[in-house]
Amino acid sequence: MLLRPSSTSKSRAKNQLIWDQLILSRCKVTKKNRHKGNKCKKNTLFCNFSCVIGKKCVILHPKLHSHEVKVIIDAHIPYLKGSLEPYASVVYLEPSEITASTVRDADCVIVRTRTRADACLLEGSHVKLVLTATIGYDHINTAYCLDHGIEWHNCPGCNAGGVCDYVESALQQLGLFAKKRTIGIVGVGHVGSLVEQMAARRGWDVVVCDPLRAKHEQATSCGNRFMAIEAVAAVADVITFHTPLTFTGSYPTYHLCNADLLRACKPDALIINSARGGIVDEVALLSSGHAAVIDCWENEPLISQEVLRHAAIATMHIAGYTRLGKYKASEMVLAHFNRFFHTDARMVETMRFPEHQLFDIESVSRSLKAQPERFEQLREAYVLR
């Protein structure tokens, strides 16, 4: 709920200006000071988007200020249309149309991985909130956003079930469930945890690597079932990656699957990358000769033809493309929007989708191998499972 100051005729213009600037910029008072009721430079007392000028306040429903919030949305994000319109001026654009000029006067942008939310897009704009309807967020320059007071959110776990189904469908297609094997899972978060459950249900042995979780479980005395990645590689018949793509920090994942790791693998091990392009060093993969299932590629959409021919199964970054996953992502986007702008946007209709389903992954692979130059078009045309 927003609080709008009442005012005398004498001060109305001044207070209106303060309010308008506050509602769009959320005055730059640090979180540390915000909840202490400190004054911003405009002499406005406030706490997390609520505002007090003088002693009198009246309640203002956010809909009354809907004209002040402009939102740019990737037109290919499903299930959002109609949800934000009561609260904002909404423009739906093709990914190629989301540019610095089109977002300049927007307060919020809602994108997918095709749009890079960086200085080139955001510099000089009014954008204060960036939302991506995806698990991955390496297309967002988070450092730039932090430095410029722009809040951002991704949708962790939204399509975890779909990616798990993708991995299971690939293993089924390759006939690997015919006997008991060992699967190594690198990254045991939303997706990796589901893959672990699936493999156990199939009767496979499971070994896992996740340094961040291992560190946490050690600190909380939960024991430690995690192994070093080299130890996982030495025993696994299948290694599947489910990490974000990171370049810095204690455990960067760029080219995590490199020549050294591949040398530690069994010669007949299968490598699966349905996480992010760049986690697997594709040149090293070719040199090693290991079989691979690849959904996420380096240099998308201009993928390597040689790697494409080498892959046992090759798809166009659609592992998480399920109706359920997209619906969950849109729900999460609305939740973030509501928290930021103090609105009450809801999904237009409630829908139910299957939680688990295998699919014909081979036909998708054949389509890409037959026309790799149409990577992006095939991805856009892919029918949600």
Where are these regions (language model features)?
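Rossmann-like adenosine-cofactor binding region
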Residues: 117-118, 215-305
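Glycine-rich adenosine-cofactor-binding loop
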Residues: 181-200
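NAD(P)-binding Rossmann-fold cofactor-contacting core
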Residues: 202-219
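Short, positively charged and aromatic/hydrophobic N-terminal segments
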Residues: 29, 45-48, 52-59, 63
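Phosphate/diphosphate ligand-binding glycine-rich loop within oxidoreductases
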Residues: 74, 108-178
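Rossmann-like dinucleotide-binding domain for NAD(H)/NADP(H)
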Residues: 268, 274-385
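N-terminal amphipathic/hydrophobic targeting modules at extreme N-termini
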Residues: 13-25, 47-48, 57
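N-terminal glycine-/charge-rich "phosphate-binding" loop or analogous flexible N-terminal tail
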Residues: 61-106, 207
